[in-house]
C-alpha cells in the first residue's frame, strides 16, 4: 500500500463490482439483515456501463434471489422461442438437429436480455433495501491488515498527472474497510489477480482459460426479425485456426445481438480476432439477415472458459472471489450469469453467518463448499471436459467426444475423468515464422467495419492527462521480443486498436499504447505471450459506456 493518508469508512461487507455477482451478494446480505452496512463500488460511470454479455439468461439465479422478479419488473422481456445450431462452411451451413443435444443445452425457459439493464434493475432493488452503491469509484489498491488478512480497498483516487504525480485536482480517494471484502470485478480483475497471486489461490489448479467475446447490436428489417430466436454457429471463418463460434439473438424492437467468440489459446499469432468477427458477418446466412440493417453498438470482453478444474481457491482471510473473478462460465451453454448470481447469494449467506457468530477477516470456507458442492459445481462439473477436448482434438472430434461426455455426465460419470487444459493462453501462442499470415478482406462499411470506427460505438472515454492504465513490466520487450518473434500480436488481438507499432524519426520500431481506446476487455493482460502487459484500473468513470449490452 502507498503512504498516502486517506479518510476511512467502515462497513460490514465491501463489494467491488456492480455486476450480477456483486449485486446479488449485496441484495442477499440486506435480505438477511437489514442492519448490515453494505457498500458496492463500481468503476463504470453508472451501473451497467461496463457490462457486456450475450446474453441468454437462465433465470435460476434470479429465481433463488428474488422469486417475485416478474412482479417487480425485471427486464426479462424476451423468452427464447426457438433454438438453432449451425455448422458453417464458407458458402453454406448445416443445421444440427436439437434432439442429439444433451438436455443441458436446451434454452427453453431462458430469456434474451441485456445484462447491463438487468444489472441496472438489480441495483435499484439493492438500493431499495438500503445498499450503498457508488458508481465511478475505481478500486485501485487492496488494503491489508498487519496479520496479512484483507482489510479493505482504496477507491476513488483520481487527478494524477501522466507521470503519476498528483495533479492540481488530485484526490487521494478513501479506504473502505470491511469485515469481509467481496471481489466481483468480472474476468481478470486487477484486484482479484493480486489476491490470487498473494495467497497462491491457484496452487494445484489448472490454468484459467479465456475467450474474447465481441458483440454488436443491430437494428434490422422488421420482416427479417424473429423475436425470441436464438442461433449459435461454429466452423467458418475460424475453421482450424482457432476455437470459437458465434451467437445471433433476436430481442425486441427489431434488434439483434450479433456476437463472436474466439478462444484465446490459438497458436497462430497472425490471427486477428476482430477481423474474424467482421468476416463472419459476410457469410451468406448472416449477411442476408443484416443487409439493410444498422449497427448501433459495439463492445468486447474477455470470457472465462477454464471451468471447474480452473477455479482457484475462492477465499483467503477477509476476502472472497465471486462470479467471473473465479470463472463460472458453462462453456457449451455459453452461460455464466446465473452462476454469478448464485455465487453472490452463497457468499452473502456465508458472510452473514460469520458476522452473526462474531467473526471477521477469516476465510469464508462455507462459501467455497457451497460453490463446489452445490448447484454451481454441479453445473460446471458436467461440462468440465468440453473445452480441453476441443483444444486437444479440434472442432469435429470434440463435438462428438464432448457431446458424449456431456451425456454420460448427466448420468453421473465420465469415461474421461477430468481432462487437463495444459498450457495457458499466453503460452499457447506460437512463433510467427511457424505460421502462415492470414489475409483479411477490407471492411465494406456496410456489414463489416474498421476497428476504430466500431470502437466509437462503445462510447469509451479516458481522461488523457492521467497515467496510462495499461503498463509494461519491461518497456523494451514489445520491440525486442514480441515484434520479431510473434509479429507484434497485440496489434491484432486487441479488439479496440489500443496497440500499434510505428516508426520513429530514426526509422526504428516504436511501441505505442493508445489507452484512450481501451474497452476494458483484458485480452492484452491474458494473451500477451511475454506476459509483459499489465491491465490496471483507470480513474473512476472512465472506459466504455454500454447502453444495452
Model regions: which residues?
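A broadly conserved sequence feature marking short terminus-proximal activation segments
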Residues: 433-496
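C-terminal auxiliary extensions adjacent to catalytic cores
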Residues: 390-446
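Residues forming the flavin
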Residues: 1-414, 463-466, 477, 482-498, ...
Amino acid at each position: 500500500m502507498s503512504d498516502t493518508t486517506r479518510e476511512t469508512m467502515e462497513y460490514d461487507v465491501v463489494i467491488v463490482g456492480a455486476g450480477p455477482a456483486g449485486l446479488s451478494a449485496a441484495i442477499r446480505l440486506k435480505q438477511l439483515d437489514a442492519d448490515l452496512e453494505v457498500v458496492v463500488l463500481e468503476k463504470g460511470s453508472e451501473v451497467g456501463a461496463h457490462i457486456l454479455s450475450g446474453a441468454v439468461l437462465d433465470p435460476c439465479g434470479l429465481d433463488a434471489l428474488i422469486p417475485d422478479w416478474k412482479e417487480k419488473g425485471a427486464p426479462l422481456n424476451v423468452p427464447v422461442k426457438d433454438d438453432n445450431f449451425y455448422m458453417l462452411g464458407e458458402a453454406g451451413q448445416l443445421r444440427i438437429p436439437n434432439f442429439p443435444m444433451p438436455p443441458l443445452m436446451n434454452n427453453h425457459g431462458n430469456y434474451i436480455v441485456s445484462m447491463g439493464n438487468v444489472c441496472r434493475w438489480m441495483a435499484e432493488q439493492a438500493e431499495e433495501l438500503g445498499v450503498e452503491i457508488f458508481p465511478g469509484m475505481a478500486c485501485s489498491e487492496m488494503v491489508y491488515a498487519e496479520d496479512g488478512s484483507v482489510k479493505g480497498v482504496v477507491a476513488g483516487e483520481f487527478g494524477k498527472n501522466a507521470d503519476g504525480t498528483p495533479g492540481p485536482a488530485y484526490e487521494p480517494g478513501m479506504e473502505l474497510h470491511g469485515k469481509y471484502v467481496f471481489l466481483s470485478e468480472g474476468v481478470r480483475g486487477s484486484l482479484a489477480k493480486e489476491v490470487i497471486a498473494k495467497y497462491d489461490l491457484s496452487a494445484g489448479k489448472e490454468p484459467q482459460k479465456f475467450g474474447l467475446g465481441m458483440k454488436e447490436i443491430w437494428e434490422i428489417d422488421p420482416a427479417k426479425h424473429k423475436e425470441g430466436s436464438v442461433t449459435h454457429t461454429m466452423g467458418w471463418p475460424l475453421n482450424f485456426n482457432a476455437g470459437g463460434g458465434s451467437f445471433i439473438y433476436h430481442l425486441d424492437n427489431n434488434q439483434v445481438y450479433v456476437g463472436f467468440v474466439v478462444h484465446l489459446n490459438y497458436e497462430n499469432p497472425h490471427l486477428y480476432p476482430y477481423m474474424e468477427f467482421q468476416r463472419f458477418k459476410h457469410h451468406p446466412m448472416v449477411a442476408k439477415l443484416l443487409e439493410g440493417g444498422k449497427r448501433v453498438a459495439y463492445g468486447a470482453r474477455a470470457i472465462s472458459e477454464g471451468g471447474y478444474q480452473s477455479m482457484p481457491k475462492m477465499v483467503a482471510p477477509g476476502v472472497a472471489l465471486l462470479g467471473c473473478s473465479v470463472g463460472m462460465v458453462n462453456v457449451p451453454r455459453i452461460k455464466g450469469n446465473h452462476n454469478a448470481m448464485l455465487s453472490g447469494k452463497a457468499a452473502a449467506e456465508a458472510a452473514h453467518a460469520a458476522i452473526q457468530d462474531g467473526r471477521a477477516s477469516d476465510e469464508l470456507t462455507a462459501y467455497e463448499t457451497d460453490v463446489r458442492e452445490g448447484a454451481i459445481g454441479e453445473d460446471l462439473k458436467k461440462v468440465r471436459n468440453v473445452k480441453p477436448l476441443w483444444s486437444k482434438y479440434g472442432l469435429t472430434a470434440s463435438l462428438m467426444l464432448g457431446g458424449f461426455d456431456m451425456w454420460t455426465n448427466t448420468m453421473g460419470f465420465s469415461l474421461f475423468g477430468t481432462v487437463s487444459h495444459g498450457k495457458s493462453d499466453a503460452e499457447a501462442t506460437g512463433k510467427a515464422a511457424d505460421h502462415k499470415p492470414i489475409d483479411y478482406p477490407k471492411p465494406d462499411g456496410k456489414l463489416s467495419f474498421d476497428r476504430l470506427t466500431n470502437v466509437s460505438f462503445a462510447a469509451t472515454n479516458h481522461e488523457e492527462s492521467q497515467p496510462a492504465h495499461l503498463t509494461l513490466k519491461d518497456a523494451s520487450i514489445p520491440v525486442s521480443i514480441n515484434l520479431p518473434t510473434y509479429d507484434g500480436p497485440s496489434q491484432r488481438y486487441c479488439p479496440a486498436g489500443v496497440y500499434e507499432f510505428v516508426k520513429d524519426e530514426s526509422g526504428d520500431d516504436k511501441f505505442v499504447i493508445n489507452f484512450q481506446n481501451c474497452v476494458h476487455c483484458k485480452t492484452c493482460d491474458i494473451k500477451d505471450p511475454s506476459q509483459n502487459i499489465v491491465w490496471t484500473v483507470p480513474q473512476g468513470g472512465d472506459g466504455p459506456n454500454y447502453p444495452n449490452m
